[in-house]
């Protein structure tokens, strides 16, 4: 296959990329800033806006050249509940704190870290917690649901009518999947459809959508994958030199210790284990580096140019906003003319601490916005004893998808 549309649904921004997978080159790119819609029944994702963006991009790209396929990748911790006709409830924003109201209840039900590799996380960051809260608050709507679909697979279903699940998403801090038992755990209520490989064709574009948007009937739509997990593929396939680290950045910084197929001993903050797109165990570490950076800079807080020992980033449990403090509780004072550089170095230090917590080794392959952040990359290079290799986002994403198809067909 050659000319494929990659739909990349990040938490903050979405991208549509027309790519030639043979040459691994991008041909055209569209971008959109995502919105969370406030109000009833709870903060939720702008599904209609994203649908217009996706279908508009497909129509625009089809006018450039014939398309041979579509693949959707998406951010984690997001699930859509559907019946035959569409959503039975809006798609909950995982930063919404509502599920915390039932935290004690849910904690008695959720599987242990040793079973799922999922640490307990706030708000809706564990999909199991989302489902528990939704089932309690909206029992009638949940009773109507036919499928629970992970975020990329919701769009695959919307484009094709075919319901599938994908392993890298199912095992990503959701409290959903028994790593040893290789099965969905009971807390989910049996709504998830069967697994299919990320590269497989789930179905073809619905005839009504093709006709409405001037697209060819029969356009293949692939199963799709979790965005961070896709970043592993070029560095974990046949002939790869291991161990290595795949670091995907954006709203979240996610780092995978490739070649270290050992469960972390305990759920330290940000530490977890999941399965990669091909079902192999990968310890990983993540924190909201992009959100923390945006929150702290937007708040115009006092930032040191050279963070002192003990200076750290903390998240307000009530608002979810990040701030910079030190462990003594003292106010952090300005320390130079470039406070953002100091913050970037601190974020890099936190990333390195996470890598050590999951016993990572080898070169770091950095993708996403932080790959172009010189201060962040310089701090990684200073603190990590192996090479650090940043790569531009669109180019790396095309390479990831091309590598996925190469591996899947091998």
Give, region by region, the residue ranges found by the protein language model.
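Active-site phosphate-binding/coordination module
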Residues: 62-127
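Nucleotide/phosphate-binding loop and acidic/charged catalytic motifs
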Residues: 70, 165-171
């Amino acid at each position: 296959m050659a000319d494929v549309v990659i739909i990349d649904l990040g938490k903050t921004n979405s991208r549509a990329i027309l790519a030639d997978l043979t040459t691994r080159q991008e041909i055209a790119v569209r971008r959109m800033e995502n919105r969370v819609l406030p109000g009833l029944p709870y903060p939720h994702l702008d599904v209609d806006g994203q649908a217009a963006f996706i279908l508009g991009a497909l129509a625009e790209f089809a006018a450039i050249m014939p398309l041979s396929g579509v693949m959707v990748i998406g951010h984690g911790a997001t699930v859509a509940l559907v019946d035959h006709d569409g959503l039975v409830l809006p798609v909950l924003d995982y930063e919404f704190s509502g599920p915390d109201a039932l935290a004690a209840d849910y904690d008695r039900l959720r599987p242990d870290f040793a079973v799922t590799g999922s640490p307990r996380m706030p708000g809706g960051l564990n999909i199991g917690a989302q489902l528990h809260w939704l089932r309690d608050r909206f029992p009638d709507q949940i009773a109507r649901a036919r499928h629970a679909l992970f975020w990329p697979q919701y769009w695959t279903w919307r484009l094709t009518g075919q319901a599938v699940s994908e392993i890298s998403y199912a095992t990503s801090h959701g409290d959903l999947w028994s790593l040893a038992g290789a099965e969905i755990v009971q807390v989910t209520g049996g709504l998830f459809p069967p697994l299919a490989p990320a590269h497989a064709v789930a179905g073809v574009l619905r005839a009504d959508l093709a006709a409405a948007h001037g697209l060819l009937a029969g356009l293949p739509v692939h199963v799709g994958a979790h965005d961070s997990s896709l970043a592993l593929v070029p560095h974990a396939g046949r002939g790869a030199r291991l161990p290595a680290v795949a670091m995907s950045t954006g709203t979240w910084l996610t780092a995978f210790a490739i070649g270290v197929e050992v469960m972390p001993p305990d759920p330290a903050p940000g530490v977890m284990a999941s399965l990669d797109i091909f079902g192999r165990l990968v310890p990983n570490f993540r924190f909201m580096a992009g959100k923390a950076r945006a929150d702290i800079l937007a708040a115009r807080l006092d930032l040191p140019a050279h963070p002192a020992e003990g200076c750290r980033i903390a998240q307000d449990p009530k608002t979810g906003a990040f701030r910079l403090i030190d462990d003594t509780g003292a106010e952090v004072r300005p320390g130079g003319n470039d406070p953002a550089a100091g913050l970037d170095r601190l974020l890099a230090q936190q990333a390195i601490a996470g890598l050590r917590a999951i016993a990572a080794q080898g070169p770091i392959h950095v993708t996403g916005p932080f790959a172009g952040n010189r201060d962040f990359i310089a701090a990684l290079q200073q603190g990590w004893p192996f090479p650090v290799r940043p790569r531009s986002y669109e180019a790396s994403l095309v390479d990831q998808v091309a590598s996925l198809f190469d591996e899947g067909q091998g």
